[in-house]
Curated annotation (Swiss-Prot):
GO terms for molecular function: adrenomedullin receptor binding; hormone activity. Residues 1-21 form the signal peptide. This is Pro-adrenomedullin. Residues 69-89, 129-175 are annotated as: Disordered. The modification Arginine amide is found at R41. It comes from the Eukaryota. Belongs to the adrenomedullin family. The record marks T116, Y125 as: Required for CALCRL receptor interaction. Residues 45-92, 153-188 form a propeptide. The gene is ADM.
Amino acid sequence: MKLVPVALLYLGSLAFLGVDTARLDVAAEFRKKWNKWALSRGKRELRESSSYPTGLADVKAGPVQTLIRPQDVKGASRSPQASSPDAARIRVKRYRQSLNNFQGLRSFGCRFGTCTVQKLAHQIYHFTDKDKDGSAPRSKISPQGYGRRRRRSLPEAGLGRTLLQPPEPKLRGAPDSRVHQVLATLRI
């Protein structure tokens, strides 16, 4: 009774592993692909060679100016085919041609809608910020005023408390940006 399940298991695994371990004929598949590529290349070269100028009138028309830059070429120019007559027909990446045609329409920076909203909010903030005064009124800075400066100026502030470091001196000619103002306020 136990021999039947073991035999079935053995035959099943042999059939399964036999399929996986079968040798693939890689050389035959490669040969097929190579022949297909060579045939298509031969047809392409035949078409291109028939389109070359052969008459004297075509030569007198003048040289044809190509619009191919060295960085647009897909392959390296050191290939053995570079000296052949079809070297003039170099394949070019298509997206570069389309980008070069529309250079005036390109804009730098973020193109997402969220970036546009953020830029607009930033511009509105800067336009409305020019009317604001950067310094506090004198009545609030005095020792009778309120806030952190009053607490610092009171005599009992030094008992048992450590004060923050004084602000660093500003560099001459450096712009007084919002970030520096916030940092200076936090250090006071």
